[in-house]
Amino acid sequence: MLKIDHLVKNYNTFSLDCSLEVLPGQITGLVGKNGAGKSTIFHAVLGLIRPDSGKITVLGKDSQEITAKDKQKLGAALSDSGFSGNLTIQDIISVLEKLYDDFNKNFFMKQVEIFGLPYKKKLKDFSTGMKAKLKVLIAISHQAKLLLLDEPTAGLDVVARNEVLDLIRDYMAEDEERAVLISSHISSDLESLCDDFYMLKDGKIIFHEETDVLLDQY
């Protein structure tokens, strides 16, 4: 579903060099402190930055060959980007209907109601929890095959965090071929969700293990 082979990206004060794989039907966790390189990986996979070297395979294709139609199968929630704070959910629905052929408006509106998200309120007036729920909801609203979720639970209280994680579980339960790469700087946030973990430190993968094995050992 996603394979990264020796992805290298160099900055003045930071260098990333990592490899990882996300298999169909699995939720893979990427854990590391802030500044470890998690967001750089997500940006590279989505084509938002150009790696210095390495290969990224997404949905079975080289990332350089991904088409606009292929990108419709990707769902992303990034920690450092999103819709303008001046938009409302009503505005966002209009955008999503134009962006994605498979946008499920009925599902989206149902979840908005369940989460109690204000339909006509500007995003800049949303709480942190509301913004987090909306980001993940947008990512899963168009039948994506691969979800890329960068710190979706950051800053959330226990109730809001569990609601976001349940949304991801429900998404995976609908299709066994789907996959998720999700990052956090706190491993305990993801222990009940992920099938396996990668630990990232200073731009390098220092640890990879299946969650069941990890919990048995520690």
PLM feature spans:
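Catalytic Walker B motif of ABC-type/P-loop ATPase nucleotide-binding domains
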Residues: 147-151, 156
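Helix-to-loop junction immediately C-terminal to a conserved catalytic motif
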Residues: 46
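The feature captures the beta-strand-to-loop junction immediately N-terminal to the Walker
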Residues: 31-33
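ABC-family P-loop ATPase nucleotide-binding domains
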Residues: 72, 78-135
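Conserved ABC transporter NBD signature motif
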Residues: 54-65, 69-70
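Helix N-cap at the start of a conserved alpha-helix in ABC-type nucleotide-binding domains
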Residues: 36, 158-160
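Helical segment within the ABC ATPase nucleotide-binding domain
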Residues: 162-176
